[in-house]
């Protein structure tokens, strides 16, 4: 790897360790020419499946869309940024684990619902009310009752 300080082509790895739950490798490097030290992170480049929407159109998986939906449901809830990031990683892993090149938006929604149910029940109900398009208060009440079971 080139040194970011002097652009020399020869650097050596001083230390390596797993970070990010074992999904990344953090390496401390030192330039053989200028002796400056720097850190690099190495992670697998994983391809996410495309999403098939309800109207049949297809679009690339959009992590920002997932994060925005979660954040809207979790607004003013006692959930840390780290917990939200962990949920995003879990959902992405579940979608990749299908082994499919394309997944339905329904599957994405169900993965989100399952994750929110475990993380925060209020956020789950908020998300479910939009995702399932409750028609009246009765349907809303039934969903809340199912949470208590």
Curated annotation (Swiss-Prot):
Cofactor(s) it depends on: Zn(2+)
PROSITE patterns: ATP_CONE
Transmembrane domains' residue ranges: none
Chain intervals annotated as zinc finger (unnamed): 3-34
Cofactor binding notes: Binds 1 zinc ion.
Source domain of life: Bacteria
Gene Ontology terms for molecular function: ATP binding; DNA binding; zinc ion binding
UniProt GO BP: negative regulation of DNA-templated transcription
Domain ATP-cone: 49-139
Keywords: ATP-binding, DNA-binding, Metal-binding, Nucleotide-binding, Repressor, Transcription, Transcription regulation, Zinc, Zinc-finger
PANTHER family: TRANSCRIPTIONAL REPRESSOR NRDR (PTHR30455:SF2)
HAMAP family, alphabetized: NrdR
Functional summary from the UniProt entry: Negatively regulates transcription of bacterial ribonucleotide reductase nrd genes and operons by binding to NrdR-boxes.
Family note: Belongs to the NrdR family.
Stated name of the protein: Transcriptional repressor NrdR
UniProt source species: Pseudoalteromonas translucida (strain TAC 125)
């Amino acid at each position: 790897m080139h040194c970011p300080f002097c652009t020399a082509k020869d650097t050596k790895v001083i230390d390596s360790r797993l970070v990010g739950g074992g999904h990344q490798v953090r390496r401390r490097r030192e330039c053989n020419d200028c002796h400056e030290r720097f850190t690099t992170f190495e992670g697998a480049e994983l391809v996410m499946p495309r999403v098939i929407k309800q109207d049949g159109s297809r679009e690339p998986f959009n992590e920002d869309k997932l994060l925005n939906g979660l954040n809207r449901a979790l607004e003013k809830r006692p959930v840390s940024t780290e917990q939200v990031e962990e949920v995003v990683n879990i959902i992405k892993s579940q979608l990749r684990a299908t082994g499919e090149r394309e997944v339905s938006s329904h599957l994405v929604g169900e993965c989100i619902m399952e994750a929110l149910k475990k993380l925060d029940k209020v956020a789950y109900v908020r998300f479910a009310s939009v995702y399932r398009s409750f028609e009246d208060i009765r349907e809303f009440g039934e969903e809340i009752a199912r949470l208590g079971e």
